Amino acid sequence: MELSDYRARIDQIDRQLVELFAQRMNTAAGIAAYKKEHGLPVLDPVREREKLLDVAAQAPEDMRDYTASLYTMLFELSRCYQGRLLGSTSPLTTEIQTAIDQTPNLFPSNVSVACQGVAGAYSQLACDKLFKLPHIMYFASFEAVFAAIERGLCRYGVLPLENSTAGSVNAIYDLMMKHDFRIVRSVRLKVDHNLLVKPGTKRSDITEIYSHQQALSQCEQYLQAFPGVKVIPCENTAVAAQKVAEGDGHAAALSSRSCMKLYGLECLEAGVQDQGSNFTRFICISKNLEIYPGADRTSLMAVLPHEPGSLCRVLSRFYA
């Protein structure tokens, strides 16, 4: 047989599959109606497991895993279709609909916002991109920002989530598992690190360099040019600039130009990050879910079984 012959055969089989799939889904609709009438749940795990074992046993031995994967997906699609027909609701769907109905059309501009660090931090720069006239409250730690939202001290909080060079901010992901919050918006901020010193300090005078651990990671190659200089992590880049301003002239900070102006420092070298295209994504969190017009991103955290197909089963629900 030629390749075209095989493809023609595949086309013929696909037409049959599509017809049978439509019949299966129509039958699933009948099952949904029966379950609704008798108050039965959409998911019947015992039936699904029995069916999966049965169809896998019918397949040739070298195709059983493929058959099981195919039917696992079919079960997901069937449940999704039944749930849609039944108009199934959950606390989450109710929360989402309530948020859509109650969230105003315009994102607020003059509100209380929690940020980690001190004035000049990159979180503040991200905050200024998100809000026109924010009332910023600074906190010593990321956890304190989460706590300020939970306790109602601030309506919003701004936190760094991931960087294009250094990757995820792991401390934030760890705290996400502990706190109750919602992501309202996010913003992508270009991050340029600069070597800041007190006026008059020369490169040869530097014995210590301060910055946040993420910034140090983003400037790792650059820092190799300072053998013998002590590299000291601190709370954030603005705190690093503050320490240099209060020091004796032998320290430097990897920080922003806004910190240079704010703390009266000089820039010895600009844009010293290892990657010129260096961006950090910041999230804006709130206590309650708010969905503003134009919202087009969904963020979620999930703990899944450590087994093949567990992530696929979750993602397939979004695709369906």
Stretches found by the model and what they are:
Residues 1-320:
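Domain-level signature for soluble enzymes in the chorismate/prephenate branch of the shikimate pathway
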